[in-house]
């Protein structure tokens, strides 16, 4: 299968930009469709620009926010450049990319089933999907709970959990097309105000990041010095 990788890479680029009538949606049927699905699925994978990953990063214990922010930046590279690229190459080399967008899980399982001996490929993908789906539910539940608590207070935590649990069941029995459409719409509604905020605060981010890197990239100073530095940054934000 390794000898098919160069052809797979060529197929991805040629079919994305020449308008080949592909049915899979992975390669796409034109440059606009390629961009549409690429951006939509990329955001769904790495949450770039949505502001949701910052909620999880804010819960981390770190000596300075800029340090955690720099670490969080790696998730886009790992999720999209490494994991998604490898998965895409497996699907294209296996020839399962034209099964249709509604058969995404079967498409991936079938591709890995051809790549690995016996039933190991399909089994690994099936088990991984269970863990990925469960962890995704937990993650987005946490994101939403932090948001609702910040908006209306702690009393909304329990009602939100009940509503989220019920909505998870609805998502499990709804059609895949409806689930994808709702997810893409929700991601867009999150990204638009967040990107506006990022643009407005871009100068602040650049200033604070430069000061952090110039101050001490390795954070080898004492805790008191770190606390003083953080306090000065908070004053500068006003």
Predicted regions and their residues:
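Terminal cytosolic tails of multi-pass membrane transporters
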Residues: 188, 192-238
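Re-entrant/interfacial helical elements at transmembrane boundaries that shape
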Residues: 51-60, 90-94, 106-110, 142, ...
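Membrane-interface alpha-helices at helix entry/exit sites of multi-pass transporters
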Residues: 62-78, 154-162
């Amino acid at each position: 299968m390794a000898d098919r990788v160069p052809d797979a890479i060529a197929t991805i680029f040629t079919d994305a930009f020449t308008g080949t009538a592909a049915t899979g949606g992975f390669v796409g049927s034109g440059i606009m469709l390629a961009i549409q699905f690429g951006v939509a699925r990329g955001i769904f994978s790495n949450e770039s620009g949505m502001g949701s990953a910052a909620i999880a990063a804010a819960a981390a214990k770190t000596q300075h926010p800029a340090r955690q922010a720099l670490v969080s930046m790696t998730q886009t590279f790992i999720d999209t450049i490494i994991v998604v690229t490898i998965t895409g190459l497996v699907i294209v080399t296996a020839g399962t990319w034209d099964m249709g967008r509604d058969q995404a899980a079967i498409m991936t399982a079938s591709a890995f089933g051809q790549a690995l001996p016996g039933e190991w490929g399909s089994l690994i993908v099936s088990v991984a999907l269970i863990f990925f789906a469960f962890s995704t539910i937990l993650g987005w539940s946490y994101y939403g709970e932090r948001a609702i608590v910040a908006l209306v207070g702690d009393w909304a935590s329990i009602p939100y959990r009940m509503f989220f649990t019920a909505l998870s069941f609805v998502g499990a029995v709804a059609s895949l097309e409806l689930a994808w459409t709702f997810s893409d719409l929700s991601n867009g509604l999150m990204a638009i105000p967040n990107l506006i905020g990022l643009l407005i605060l871009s100068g602040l981010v650049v200033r604070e990041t430069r000061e952090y890197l110039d101050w001490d990239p390795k954070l080898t100073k004492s805790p008191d010095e770190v606390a003083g530095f953080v306090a000065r940054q908070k004053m500068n934000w006003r």
